[in-house]
Every structure is written in C-alpha cells, then in structure tokens.
C-alpha cells in the first residue's frame, strides 16, 4: 500500500559507485515505512565552485551531474497536470561555465512517484538581486487555482548565510514571478531569537476558515556558515488572514501628481483596465472601517 509517500535525499549504491540523489519510501499508515528498492531515482551532485566544467573529458568524476536537483526539496500533488511535482534547489553554473556556483529553483515530476523526469530549471537569481543572493530551496503549494512559492532567499554575505522568505507566484507552476522582492513575506526576527538567522519553509500551510497557518523552522544564525555550536533552533508559526497574501494600505493624505486635488482620509485605488464581460460578481477583501 502506497497511501503515504516520502521523498528524501541520501547516498545510494549504483553499480560501482555511490551517488547522492533522490530516494523515495512508502507507507500504508504513515508510521511504518519501506524504502523503495531502486535508488537513487535521480542522481544529484556536490562540489565547490571552480571545480569541474560540465562534460570535461579530462576528468573522471561521475558524481558531477550538471543542473541536478540538490538536497532540499518539497513535493506536492499538482491537480492540474495530475502528477507529483517536486520543487527544490538546483545547481546552476557560474558565468565562466564552472559548476556549483549558486542554487536556483528546479522542478521534476512523476505520475507514479518512482519514475521522475529530467529536472528543469525554472527560476534563478538575476541582475536585480544582490551578488551574494541565491535560493536555498523553493517550496510550492497550490491554492485558489494559483501556485505560490515560499522562496528561501539565502544571502551568503551576511552572518554565515541568512535566509528570509520571499513570496513567488505562478499561474502554471512553471513560469514564476517575483513581484515582492522589496518586502519579504516572512522576515527573520531579532538576533536574540531562535529564528534570527534563518527561516525554513515548507509546502504544507494549514488552511482554516479565517486564517492560513505557516509553520516553519528557524536557526538563530546563518544556515550555511555558522560555526558556533551554541546557536539554537526551533519551530515557529506565522498566521495570515485568509487570502491576504498581498494588499494595499491607505495613507492619510494622497497628493500624487495624477490627482486633480489632494485626498484627505479617502482610500482610492486605480487599477489597470480589466475586462469583466463574462463576470457577474466581484469580491473585495477589504476593511473599510
């Protein structure tokens, strides 16, 4: 019985070599698990930037797998494509062609949780991001016909690699947009808190009638370079009023140049043209008190 499914990364023997990669396990009750006999199902890769250039024939390093998924992934069931989709960190090559430069957002899918397609690279840090920023991993969940990503933004230039959470959105789970770069969805707490250094999200928020609960893990220091073994960790909870992933907050005085005259204590929103020919109702999620 494969009612419960688990995806994890581990080292496994494949012919003559031992490789890291994607492994799976199944359970009938969620308590007793059995590892799937074939592993790894997808080979991963490891190393340091400046090592092998992909497909260099002078090197014999079978563990160098270009554009492979790495060791932090989250899996969901994609109701649109009717497949299991696994999102996570994926190695991207540097400007000089060397491997193991940074991590971007990768994806692979499977119909049976065993046979996984070649991973695709979906989204990467770009010229609008600081130089030392990359994605630690990118958990995705499907809600209200939209794909949301709780992207873990890793900044290696601060405190051994701190992580804050950026909200990403997609209409198809493949093409991703990052419209909220200037405001983190979940930010680290103060330096004396368990989540003052890094926040780790997942793909399973708890949806209730009036709120959405996001449980997360936290480190008091950076996630990749902290050598202080006195740092603490824990589990935190962030609560969002239901469906308020983003919003507008009024100001007491609006005096921008597009107005004929300043508006005092009046909330006004101007939207782009929207075609409403086939719609009967519009729902506004707002507090007008």
Task: Enumerate the language-model features and the residues they cover.
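Carbohydrate-active catalytic/glycan-binding domains of CAZyme proteins
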Residues: 1-289
């Amino acid at each position: 019985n494969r009612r419960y499914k688990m995806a994890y990364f581990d080292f496994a023997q494949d012919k003559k070599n031992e490789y890291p990669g994607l492994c799976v396990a199944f359970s009938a009750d969620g308590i007793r698990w059995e590892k799937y006999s074939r592993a790894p199902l997808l080979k991963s890769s490891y190393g340091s930037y400046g090592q092998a250039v992909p497909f260099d024939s002078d090197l014999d390093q079978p563990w160098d797998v270009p554009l492979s998924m790495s060791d932090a992934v989250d899996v969901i069931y994609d109701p649109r494509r009717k497949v299991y989709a696994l999102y996570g960190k994926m190695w991207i090559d540097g400007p000089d062609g060397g491997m193991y430069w940074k991590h971007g957002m990768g994806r692979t899918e499977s119909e049976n949780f065993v046979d996984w397609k070649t991973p695709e690279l979906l989204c990467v840090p770009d010229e609008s991001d600081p130089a030392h920023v990359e994605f630690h991993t990118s958990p995705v969940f499907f809600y209200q016909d939209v794909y949301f990503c709780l992207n873990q933004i890793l900044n290696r230039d601060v405190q051994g690699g701190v992580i804050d959470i950026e909200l990403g959105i997609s209409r198809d789970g493949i093409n991703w947009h990052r419209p909220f770069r200037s405001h983190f969805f979940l930010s680290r707490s103060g330096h004396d808190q368990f989540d003052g250094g890094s926040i780790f999200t997942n793909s399973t928020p708890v949806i209730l009638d009036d709120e959405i609960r996001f449980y997360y893990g936290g480190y008091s220091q950076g996630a990749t370079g902290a050598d202080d073994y006195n740092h603490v960790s824990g589990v935190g909870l962030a609560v969002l009023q239901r469906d308020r992933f983003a919003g507008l907050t009024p100001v007491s005085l609006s005096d921008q140049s597009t107005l004929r005259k300043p508006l005092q204590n009046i909330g006004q929103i101007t939207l782009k043209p929207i075609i409403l020919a086939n719609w009967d109702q519009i729902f506004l999620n707002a507090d007008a008190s």
